[in-house]
């Protein structure tokens, strides 16, 4: 997992509410378990429309997706955050995320940022006025700044540490390897062991 400390980027607008994981990553592309190679399938059906924001030249290379209310609803599929990250997004800003989508995103180092409707609408207005507008996100300070729009976001300390240091679940487990080995050595032989 890559480390995320600061993100400075243009933003890609997705001004739609209740975008579910099947729209983000359609079910026909869920046959693999690798984490990479999903970017091309992101919003697959919507990309057939040449006016869809992912198709527009001015938004190519954006690392921040600004989405409408209630992003990532529906079934739990890790492939949806994988596709977003594979496309190049490091962060998503919305008013609300489905809990499991939020957790799946944090687990791979994709930063979900919840904020007020006023802030999201303000960002949409900035993007519409000038697609080259940059946003600056500090994971360390838990802050977002885009010109005069400034706000803080909630992120628990453990998730913040994981994103700042690029730690996935395996990395975290390996940090406790000596404790695991000590536990195994102290257990009676007839009891099950962690190996």
Spans of features found by a protein language model:
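Cytosolic catalytic domains that perform sulfur/thiol-centered chemistry
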Residues: 1-68, 72-195
């Amino acid at each position: 997992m890559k480390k995320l400390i600061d993100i400075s980027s243009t933003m890609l607008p997705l001004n739609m509410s209740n975008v579910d994981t099947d729209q983000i990553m359609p079910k026909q592309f869920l046959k693999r378990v690798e984490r990479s190679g999903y970017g091309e399938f992101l919003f697959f059906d919507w990309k057939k429309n040449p006016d869809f924001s992912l198709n527009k030249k001015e938004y190519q290379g954006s690392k921040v997706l600004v989405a409408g209310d209630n992003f990532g609803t529906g079934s739990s599929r890790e492939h949806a955050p994988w596709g977003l990250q594979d496309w190049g997004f490091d962060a998503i800003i919305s008013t609300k995320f489905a809990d499991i989508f939020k957790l799946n995103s944090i687990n791979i180092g994709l930063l979900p940022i919840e904020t007020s409707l006023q802030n999201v609408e303000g960002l949409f207005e900035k993007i519409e006025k000038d697609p080259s507008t940059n946003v600056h996100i500090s994971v360390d300070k838990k802050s977002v700044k885009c010109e005069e729009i400034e706000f803080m976001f909630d992120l628990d300390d453990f998730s913040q540490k994981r994103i700042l240091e690029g730690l996935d679940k395996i990395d975290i487990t390996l940090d406790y390897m000596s404790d695991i080995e000590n536990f195994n050595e102290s257990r009676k032989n007839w009891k099950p062991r962690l190996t």
